[in-house]
């Protein structure tokens, strides 16, 4: 594998955590767009998302969607083999963030408080493996590879990683120590948007940005990298819009109507209001999970993002709804409070 990486100009792994958030999801997305089948799948997915945005499904589901997770820990040095407690801390954060139960949601300026969404999704470590055997929902693989890239090597045992579990039954999360873009830039994680190959479906996160304890390091030690990347896995774009065909950054869109137009990603912890694209007086919604701010400053999804996620759950991720319905035949379904339609 070393020769392959060096041919791209990446000579050695760095143990430094990036000081600013960088995500490789769009790099993976643009690579997959070279495939005609992926383009067709994405067109169908976006057409459904547009219908939902236009009111095709005005009222969201009441039942909680519960998604089984398998965490593949791929480690080289012993300290990279993160603890069960660190993994559980990440699951706990996801269940707060996707249910609007995070205490720091109070940071949202009052002008946007009515937009904060409960996405109605909960996550749990899988209790059965693909063969029906009991499992902790965690796999552990020691590797000789010292770093991985957005080319998905971590997702295959043949290249030093671990093979995915069936993507229609589990959310696969790979955790590794060092992760780089194709040009050698250190990144915190990346996700594959719905519509791509099943064998690479899921998210990848470095251990320094995973969970809230153990190897997690500030400013990415609040578990929000996984929240951000799973947002992509559920078909959310970056809040500033990612389309490269527009020279004017203010012409890009995240395909969500209630997120203000903004020019570029925000980093660190901006002061409110932070104005761009003539979006004053309130400015950028930089506290949104789909921006690039530090963990402690991203605290919300919007109702429009929830609608887009619902389209994803009814479309390319619908297998998880079927599993919820099967489970709930045996027990009373969990419910959530829904906002009144406006």
Curated annotation (Swiss-Prot):
Chain sites annotated for binding substrate: 188-189, 225, 295
Q: What is its EC number?
A: 3.4.24.-
**Annotated Zn(2+) binding sites:** 228, 232, 238
Q: How is its activity regulated?
A: Inhibited by EDTA, excess zinc, and also significantly by batimastat in vitro. Is not inhibited by other metalloprotease inhibitors like phosphoramidon, captopril and galardine or those targeting other classes of proteases.
Activity sensitivity to pH:
Optimum pH is 7.5.
What biological processes does GO assign it? proteolysis
The note on cofactor binding and number reads: Binds 2 calcium ions per subunit. Binds 1 zinc ion per subunit.
Q: Where is the composition biased (Basic and acidic residues)?
A: 1-11
Q: Which cysteines are joined by disulfide bonds?
A: 250-277, 269-297
Give me the ranges of the annotated region Disordered: 1-20, 323-342
Keyword Cell inner membrane assigned: no
**PTM description:** The inactive zymogen pro-ulilysin undergoes calcium-mediated autolytic activation to the mature ulilysin. Autoproteolytic activation entails removal of the first 60 residues and of a highly charged 20-residue C-terminal tail.
Q: Which residues form the active site?
A: 229
Please list the GO terms describing molecular function.
Answer: metal ion binding; metallopeptidase activity
Q: What cofactor does this chain's UniProt record say it requires?
A: Ca(2+); Zn(2+)
User: What keywords are assigned to this protein?
Assistant: Calcium, Disulfide bond, Hydrolase, Metal-binding, Metalloprotease, Protease, Signal, Zinc, Zymogen
- The chain's coiled-coil residues are none
Q: Name one Pfam family in it.
A: Peptidase_M43
**Annotated function:** Metalloprotease which in vitro specifically cleaves IGFBP-2 to -6, insulin, and extracellular matrix proteins but not IGFBP-1 or IGF2. Shows a preference for substrates with an arginine in the P1' position, the first position downstream of the scissile bond.
* Domain comment quoted from the record: Consists of two subdomains separated by an active site cleft containing the catalytic zinc ion.
Q: What is this protein called?
A: Ulilysin
Report the source organism: Methanosarcina acetivorans (strain ATCC 35395 / DSM 2834 / JCM 12185 / C2A)
């Amino acid at each position: 594998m070393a020769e392959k990486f060096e041919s791209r100009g990446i000579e050695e792994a760095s143990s430094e955590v990036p000081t600013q958030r960088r995500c490789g999801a769009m790099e993976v997305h643009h690579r997959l767009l070279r495939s005609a089948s992926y383009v067709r799948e994405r067109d169908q997915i976006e057409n459904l998302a547009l219908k939902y945005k236009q009111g095709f499904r005005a009222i969201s589901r009441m039942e909680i969607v519960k998604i089984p997770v398998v965490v593949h820990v791929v480690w080289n040095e012993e300290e990279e083999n993160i603890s069960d407690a660190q993994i559980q801390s990440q699951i706990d954060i996801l269940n707060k963030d996707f249910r609007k139960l995070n205490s720091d949601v109070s940071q949202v300026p009052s002008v946007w408080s009515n937009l904060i969404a409960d996405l109605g999704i909960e996550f749990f470590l899988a209790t059965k493996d693909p063969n029906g055997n009991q499992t902790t929902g965690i796999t552990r693989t020691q590797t000789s590879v010292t770093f991985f890239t957005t080319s998905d090597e971590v997702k295959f045992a043949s290249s030093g990683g671990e093979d995915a579990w069936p993507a229609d039954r589990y959310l696969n999360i790979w955790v590794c120590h060092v992760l780089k873009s194709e040009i050698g830039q250190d990144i915190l994680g990346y996700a594959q948007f719905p519509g791509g190959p099943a064998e690479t479906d899921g998210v990848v996160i470095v251990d320094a940005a995973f969970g809230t304890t153990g190897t997690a390091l500030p400013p990415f030690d609040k578990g929000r990298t996984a929240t951000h990347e799973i947002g992509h896995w559920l078909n959310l774009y970056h809040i500033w819009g990612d389309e490269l065909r527009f020279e004017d950054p203010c012409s890009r869109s995240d395909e969500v109507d209630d997120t203000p137009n903004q020019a570029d990603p925000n980093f660190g912890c901006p002061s409110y209001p932070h104005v761009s694209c003539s979006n004053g007086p309130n400015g950028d919604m930089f506290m949104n999970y789909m921006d690039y701010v530090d963990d402690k400053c991203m605290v919300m999804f919007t109702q429009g993002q929830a609608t887009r996620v619902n389209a994803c759950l009814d479309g390319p991720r619908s297998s998880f709804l079927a599993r919820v319905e099967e489970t709930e035949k045996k027990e009373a379904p969990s419910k959530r409070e829904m906002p009144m339609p406006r």
